[in-house]
Structures are given as structure tokens and as C-alpha cells.
């Protein structure tokens, strides 16, 4: 049926900030959906709280609201806009849950607003564990024995009845939040309690574990006329028991027989039809490897993480099709945009293999529990395409941007056989490298299968690569072996290590023998129909399908997988760089490895190469395309790190030169510039040995800030207060070498700020200065920030502007740069300069109206700021005040300390804007899920050195009606100052008492925890345990007093003070 004419205005609910379990894939799907609806002539109103995304650009929807995703906030917008319908199935679990919550308030019925796409009843039937189980039984589809419970007691009773192991699956959550595998009553009681608290409907499914089965996923589409089709079938490398978001995944499925495939396909289609889902949906199934028995795990009645992967794996734009189906169109009348000739009902066919590997944050969180299970822990993922499973997997491994560039891990190599076997049995993020090591040591396929339950086929792929490794080692400079190794995805540096040569020598040898990659097209139809997609992957095969167009081209290097410190903000900048190049008439070519993002949507750039971001892979594309040059400023540290290698091979780096980038990033060279310009900076020393670091710290005087050079996201950065802490830091973190010195800085406690600037070599434009709300010492990515600044005088802003201009011109910056300052006692100190786009670009672009990445790209390509209509210096400030607040994923990562310091820990951000600072703060806190009651109970656990600072904060809490709880030391101090305080006993004192601090938290007596015990970093220390308990109980937690001060400003604005007259 043709699209509906009875609706005109559609509201799309976005997915909010990036957290573990819900990352950039919803920026991609939401952007696609909004554009698809506008393409069909509908007016689109978008609500999302995340400023870092392309989705919240004003070009994506007719009206964009960056507001908190709360029922109150969205209800206000609905009453203002009066949409005819809401499309909730493209904003992840957040969008879906918000639609359900809005429906329950009655506002949708009251204003006669329809939910488009999958109907409410179907969503509830798929998401409510009990209803879904009953539906499967009616359809005759098998599900594991299970029971829906609302209490811990009911969970334990059922567990005892059916026996362990058991899986807990909370209702209406995503990323496996709150769930887990339980091997006994104690584990079940703990996990069920947590799951019930995190489920918005206080409900969990307790299910007999089927761990060890094959895990298969189908991405399915269905329209209003009951046409249904399979877009993609994916198979997990890891068996059931590890969350699919934490599993290595292959597409198409690798081990299913035709009978198994058809059986599971029929089941998926039967489910989507029975649920009457309209749009995209993800079906997860478990197949017994030894029979034809299978079980249905779950159905996601929405576009999901797997949909983004399936879209990129096949080229079939699922979210775009789902949006068109939602407005009444059918699969047989929507054109497939890839071929331009076939229709959307044709099932994609793949003549290649796709491999996805998750990207985990454990390089940041070394003390975290790395065990993988049913609760997702990865922050992002990479995808690679090859002609063989081996090639796809090797390309995916080197896309991860971790220490391991292939299947060799030094840590695995050094492990004893006992440790190796433990690592195989208990899956962690590095299991793949231990699998490879097992085969190097001669373990048989049977041995490894027995330990891991991973399918023999997948183990054989890993074993084959290790055999190939051995052949390479034994046949140095053998051309036929080299050709075969390249077909199986071996990189030049890996081969160089095996041959005892350099990567450049291998590259030259390979090219001399005509061993160069060709590029194949991703066309959805295995070349069955003519296709025009400019979407390519490399392989070592015969025919090349990518040809130079003859137009002037520029290559833009993306930012790779989403990880802490390098998030979706860099993808935003990449996409805007591409747009600017296209407007200037250049052919814009993107190289990236992340399937979740907008930049890897083939319709964004003129050509997309889905490749690892390594020197070899990028050079191969440069060899083919011969671009005017490469832009590296927008891909974070990933692309900056490639610049020197590319230039050494004759590739032109556009914008700031490699030499000048090095002058900004090399500490010694940068210090020379600061001295030459007579600028202030915290005193600092550089050391290349452990002894040198300790000597430097003692010379400067504690506290000091220590960090390695050349890092992003404050990795391995800490404030240390004495020699003992410094020695622990050196032991835990750091490999020091002459070319990787450690920087030791005097720690300045002042007000920090971020400046993004664009320079054309003559003029320097500062779109804005962002003032951090927390004092120096909290990483800029974890700080709340406000624009325009609230405490800086005009004189300070002028000083910041002058210093920025001096640095930009001295560093010969052409394009964009970011500078961090500390303001203290009216003086401005330079902390660091990043000669690239920073994570604040999307936020500042949206609130200033200056498209910073586009302006910078035009500058890079030779168009001056004046020619673009911009002046020199600080841009004028708007009337609106905007606050950026970080969002964390601590609830997904056991044992990660939530105390904030110089190493970045946040996974996403939200924005609040209003006409007053207090209201903007309130919206930012609400967006970050820190909505507090007007009066409640606050628990204060404070370091001795913060006692004086807590007094005014505690008094303000008391004035707005909060009860104050504290342990003895803090309580005595506050009582002496005339405050009423409820005493709680310490963590290890009288653990059974009701007033024990942990029991107060467990019993939901506390609404907010303020904990500044930063030295309590050991897992058994009071400060750490209190922070962990607050996270587990979902109680808002603050670890900086400046944040508490900001929160009070927001709360005071909502509350009425009650003061006596006398």
C-alpha cells in the first residue's frame, strides 16, 4: 500500500547518550530514519539528549530538540508540537521504553497520537518475558524452561526446582543489563535482586541455561501486508552464554547446514508474523550443535545493534526501510537504494565473509572484572570484510587498535599451561589470543573444544592461521607462501616479524612481485544485478572493482571503534568534513572500520572503504586512489597516529603538517614553544626511568600529575599525593622508554576550560570557551562544562583568546585545534594543545551555529576564514546557556572504580540548554538520569582534606529539606557546626545493623551519595565499597564537590527556601 496521507508530522525519539549496550548504532539508524521520512515528505520532530551525534544536527529533522529523555520533558514537547504520530522503534531500548511510559500516562490517547511501526501490544508481547514465552508455546516454538518472577524468593524457589546453571534476564532492559548466569543459590539471589531493581517493570525471567549451544541471529523485516524477509543471518563464534554484543560474530552463518538454516529461518519468520512487527526486528536462537534441537532466546522488536551490523554487512539499509514501512509502504514498492533496480523484498546475498569483533574498555580499566557473560561490557565494535573467514578475522583483529596487531599476544605467550587453560575455560576479552597460543603449543582441536565449547569449524579457522604462521616462518621470502598468506589476511608487519624484516621491506617485496590488493564492491546481491554502490573492501583476488573517477579526491580517515576517550564525537567531525569536501567539488573518500557509525553509511561519502585503520591498509587505498591528500584532523588520535607514516611514504597530509603536529605533541618541543612565547604553564619535568620520575616528583613537590606522552582520554594519568602512591602507579601502569617518556607536572588546583580554535595561518577563530564545572584534576571528558563561561571575566576571556592565537600561529596550525587551560588567581596556564578536532566539536557546533568541522575543512583546502565570512578572535556568545554532562556505564563494569580523576571513564554525554544556568544544569542532570527528589536523604563520605569545603554544601542541602547522613568523623564535624546529622556506622563496623552504611543503601534509604574518598582505590577499602554499592543500587553518586555544588544550584532553583525572619 502507498504511504499514508493522513499523517503529516512525526516525532522520532532518539536513544540518548552512549552507554555500554547502546552505542553509535542508534545515531546511524536514527539519522537514516529521519532522512527517510523527510524523503517521503513528512515533517520530522526529533527529541534526543545527545549533542555528540549527527542525528541531532538541524539538517536531519525539521525540528530538533536536544532535551532530557524523560516523560515530563517529552510530554511538554508533544503539547508544543502536536505530532500526528511517534516512531519509537529506532531509538534503541531507551526510545522504546519512553514510548511505553508515555502511553501509560494517557497523553497519546488524549491527543490522539498514534505509535507508528510495531504496535504497543506487539512490543509488550516481545519485551515482556512471560507473554513472549506463552506466545512461543502457542506457536509450538521451543523455549528453555523458565519462569517470570517479581521477587528474589520466587527466583530462588524456581532455581532450586529446575537446577543450575540458570540465566537471569530482566524485562525491558538492553545490553543484558542486570542479568547473568548463576551457578548456585547465592549467585541467583544477588543477580535476581539486581535485575529486579534495574527492570523498569520489576520483572525477570529465570531460565534454564543453554550455555554451549550455537548462537544464531536473524535480522528480519516485515511490512503491513505481511510480506516478510530475512536481511541477514549471523553466527556467533562464541557459544550461548556470552552476550551477543560481546561475541565475535560472522555473517553469513558459517556452520549451518541447509536444513538447519531453513528451520531457523522459518522459525524467525513465524515469530515476526505472529508478533505483527512492522519494520525491522532481531531474532536470537540457540541451536544444539549435536542435533536439530533449538530454542528461541529472544526477539528485539526494534532496530538494534545487530541491525547496524547487518546493514553494513549486507549494504541493505534496515533503518531506512523500517521507517518507510512504518508509514505504510510495503517491501515490494520500496526501491533497494543499493542496486537502484531491485526492490526491498529481495533478500541480500553475500559473496564474502564479514567478521565483527567487540572493542572492550579494559585497556582503560585494568582492575575491572574482564569475564564475559550475559551482561554486555564492550563499548564498541569493528567489522572487517574478506573473501575467507580467516582474512575477515585477521583484518578485524588489526582494526581493534589494541596492543595486539595479530593473533600473537606476549601475555598469552608467557602464560603457563595452567593459566592458558583457565583463560580458555573462563572467557575474557583476550580469549582469541589464548586460543591461538594453545594451537602454537600443539593442543588439538578436541582439547580446545572441550575447554571452550567453541564450534570445531571456528577453532579450525584459528588453527589454520597458526599453521600458516609456521609456514611463513619456515619459508622466508617465498613468493607463493606470501601470496597465500595475504589471501588469509596476514599483514605486512606480521609477516615482517616472522621473517625478521621490516614492514617496509615486506611491502616492497610484495609489490615487486605484483602482490597487491584488489577492491570488491558490497552490492547486496552477490553481483547478480548491476549495482552502483561506492562501498568497497580489500582482498587478494583477481579482479579489481574500484576505479579512480578522474575527479580531484581527498581521503578522510575515520576514528575506528567507539572506545572511552574516542567516541561518536569524532565520527560527527568526520561526516562534516566529508560534507564540506563535497560542497567544494571534491570526491570525498572515507576509510573506517566501525559498523555502528554514520560515516560508514555508503550514502554519506562518494566512496567508502571498509578497512582497518593501519598504515598498510590506508596506504593500499592511497596507492589506488592517488588523492590530492589525506585529512587526519577529525579521526581522533587514531588518524593523527597514522600521519607520520603516511607522509614518510609520500602521501600528502592536508592541514597542519606532521612536523607541527609533533611540535604540539612532543613534550620537550612544546615546552620550548611555551618558553619562547613567555606563556604560563604548570611546572613540569620529563623522565625516562622510574628513578627519574620519583626524583622529578620530589623536586616539584606533591601532589603531582603523572602521565605518559602521546595518549588520548587521559589513559594512565593520575594525581599522586605521595611517594608510595607514585611507586604503585609506576608498578601498575607504565612502560617507560627513551621514546616514551613520563610527564610529571605540578598539580594546579584551578578552574579548567577547553577552547576549540580554527586557524588559517593568518586569522584564528575561537567559536567558544567551555568552562569546566569541576576543578582541575577531573579529565575534561568527565567534567561537566558550561558555555558561555559563568565565572570568567572579560579580561580572562581576552587572555585566553590572545594565548590561543599566539599558539595557533606559532604552531602553524591550519585547520582545527583544541587547547586546555587552567585559570587560577586571574592567570591563564596552558595545560596542553591537541592539533586536531576534540570531543567538544559537536557540542560547540550545535550551540554556536558554527559548523566547526566544515569551516576547518574549508580552511584545510585553502579557503580563508575571511572568505568564509568569519572574523578573528572570540565569536560572540549566544543568550542561551548550555551545559554538557558526562554519562557513565559503571553499572555494566564490576570492579571499576567510579571515583573521577584525570583518566577518562565516561562513555557518553548529554546537553541541557536554557535561559538560566540553574535551569540548564537541571536539564543536564535530568538527561544524565540524575533526577533527584526536592527533598530526600544525602549520604556524605568525605576525605579529611575536604571537610571545610563540605560544610557550606551540607548547609545548603539542609536548607532545601534534605536529611544528612554521615559516618562518625564527618558527622562530628558537621554537628559542631550546628547541623543535624543522622549517624551511620562504617562499612566494616557492625555489618548486620540497620544503620550500617551499606544496609542504608541496600534498603533504599539514600537518594544521593557524595563520596570524595579518592585514596580508597583497593577493592576492600571503605570508599571503594560505598561507591560500588551506590552503583549497584542505582543511587546517584558524585565524587567531586564542584559537581555537588552544581547539583545544588539546580535543586535550589526548583525548591523554595524556608527562612525565619529573625
Swiss-Prot record:
Region of interest (Carboxyphosphate synthetic domain), residue spans: 1-401
Cofactor remark from the record: Binds 4 Mg(2+) or Mn(2+) ions per subunit.
Pfam hit, one: CPSase_L_D3
Region of interest (Carbamoyl phosphate synthetic domain), residue spans: 547-929
Cofactor(s) in the UniProt record: Mg(2+); Mn(2+)
Residues at which Mg(2+) 3 binds: 820, 832
Subunit structure: Composed of two chains; the small (or glutamine) chain promotes the hydrolysis of glutamine to ammonia, which is used by the large (or ammonia) chain to synthesize carbamoyl phosphate. Tetramer of heterodimers (alpha,beta)4.
Source species of the chain: Lactobacillus acidophilus (strain ATCC 700396 / NCK56 / N2 / NCFM)
Gene this protein is translated from: carB
Protein name: Carbamoyl phosphate synthase large chain
Enzyme Commission number(s) of this protein: 6.3.4.16, 6.3.5.5
Residues engaged in binding Mn(2+) 1: 284, 298
Binding site for Mn(2+) 4: 832, 834
Root EC class: ligase
ATP-grasp domain segment(s): 133-327, 671-861
Keyword RNA-binding (UniProt): no
Sequence positions that bind Mg(2+) 4: 832, 834
Protein residues bound to Mn(2+) 3: 820, 832
Binding site for ATP 2: 707, 746, 748, 752, 777-780, 820, 832
HAMAP family xrefs: CPSase_L_chain_A (MF_01210_A), CPSase_L_chain_B (MF_01210_B)
